[in-house]
Amino acid sequence: MAALQEVLLAVLLWPVLVTISNPINCGDEQSSLSNCLSISEEKLLDRESFSTLSSSIVFLKNHVLCLRRCLSHSQYSSRQARQENACMTKVLPIPSSKSEIQQITDKWLLHAVLMLVQSWIKPLVYLQTTMVRYDYASDVLLNKTKWVLEKLISLEQGVVILIKKILNEAVMTTTVSELDLFPTDLQPDILESVMNDYSLLSCFKKDARKIEILLKLLKCRRNDMYNCA
């Protein structure tokens, strides 16, 4: 139980997991937790991970908003109405009452989190690619976009570990191809692209909040399901 709680805590604190340049390999049944997650005690106790993610998304949104304002204001105004409501996040009911939390399963929670995480990896790869095209995009903005993408991929790896540990299931991580990194269908209209990026970040922030809630529910259920609310 102690080892499992360590894994749960590590996933909740996913920014300190190994990055995409050092993928996790926990396929061996004999692999210990320490082999799967190389993490110091100080980082393990860092409880600011999700607030860091949230603030990073807000940072990106604010900077993309600045990019929009750098472009023609009249052009933006003519398109704003149809773009602001373009958010399409995953329809996923979040259990809220004590009875709902008791009725769901760990499997449902884990696969719901994995679905949300994997649905955003390629859109964020695309976002990183489009950011490079903006004349007004600073190095800080580009680095922050890369950071968010890397942490999302680390989170996916952490959830895969949990599924292996708790459900004894093997699942595949997302494969990012060269076409994803350098898409050929980039929109020639920079204004449209900036507005799409802003809408994408708005959607991602909503789903990131869902991911945080579901992982906290999972941790709570594993500790004391009948008093979890």
Swiss-Prot record:
<feature type="disulfide bond">
    <location>
        <begin position="26"/>
        <end position="36"/>
    </location>
</feature>
<comment type="similarity">
    <text>Belongs to the somatotropin/prolactin family.</text>
</comment>
<dbReference type="GO" id="GO:0031667">
    <property type="term" value="P:response to nutrient levels"/>
</dbReference>
<dbReference type="GO" id="GO:0045927">
    <property type="term" value="P:positive regulation of growth"/>
</dbReference>
<protein>
    <recommendedName>
        <fullName>Somatolactin</fullName>
    </recommendedName>
</protein>
<feature type="glycosylation site" description="N-linked (GlcNAc...) asparagine">
    <location>
        <position position="143"/>
    </location>
</feature>
<dbReference type="InterPro" id="IPR001400">
    <property type="entry name" value="Somatotropin/Prolactin"/>
</dbReference>
<dbReference type="GO" id="GO:0005131">
    <property type="term" value="F:growth hormone receptor binding"/>
</dbReference>
<feature type="disulfide bond">
    <location>
        <begin position="87"/>
        <end position="203"/>
    </location>
</feature>
<keyword id="KW-0732">Signal</keyword>
<feature type="signal peptide">
    <location>
        <begin position="1"/>
        <end position="21"/>
    </location>
</feature>
<keyword id="KW-0372">Hormone</keyword>
<dbReference type="InterPro" id="IPR009079">
    <property type="entry name" value="4_helix_cytokine-like_core"/>
</dbReference>
<dbReference type="GO" id="GO:0046427">
    <property type="term" value="P:positive regulation of receptor signaling pathway via JAK-STAT"/>
</dbReference>
<dbReference type="GO" id="GO:0005615">
    <property type="term" value="C:extracellular space"/>
</dbReference>
<dbReference type="GO" id="GO:0048513">
    <property type="term" value="P:animal organ development"/>
</dbReference>
<keyword id="KW-0964">Secreted</keyword>
<dbReference type="InterPro" id="IPR018116">
    <property type="entry name" value="Somatotropin_CS"/>
</dbReference>
<keyword id="KW-0325">Glycoprotein</keyword>
<keyword id="KW-1015">Disulfide bond</keyword>
<dbReference type="Pfam" id="PF00103">
    <property type="entry name" value="Hormone_1"/>
</dbReference>
<dbReference type="GO" id="GO:0070186">
    <property type="term" value="F:growth hormone activity"/>
</dbReference>
<dbReference type="GO" id="GO:0060396">
    <property type="term" value="P:growth hormone receptor signaling pathway"/>
</dbReference>
<feature type="disulfide bond">
    <location>
        <begin position="220"/>
        <end position="228"/>
    </location>
</feature>
